[in-house]
Amino acid sequence: VSTAEFTFLGFLPHKKGRETLFKEIASSERAMVFYESTHRILKTLESLEKHTPKFKVVIARELTKVFEEFIEGTPAEVLEYLNTNKEKQRGEFVVIVVPR
């Protein structure tokens, strides 16, 4: 993943402005990095699939811990992986969205 230029967003808003932010991510030419909770990771991937279906997504799960893991693909591919592997839906997530 090229991270020569990226924007760090912190945690995304819960409701107000969330869809607007996904539209901004879709129109960006730089990588976007943000945190996501275990309770919202699937909804976030669904929104990314809607707004950025061809972008590359990397989910960094449990960074700096024993079970650190990186999952990458399109939003649909990552969503399918997490739906198939329910135990992977837990933990702390860093999400990187990269335009193609």
PLM-predicted stretches and their roles:
Residues 1-28:
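Class I SAM-dependent methyltransferase SAM-binding "motif I" and its flanking Rossmann-like core
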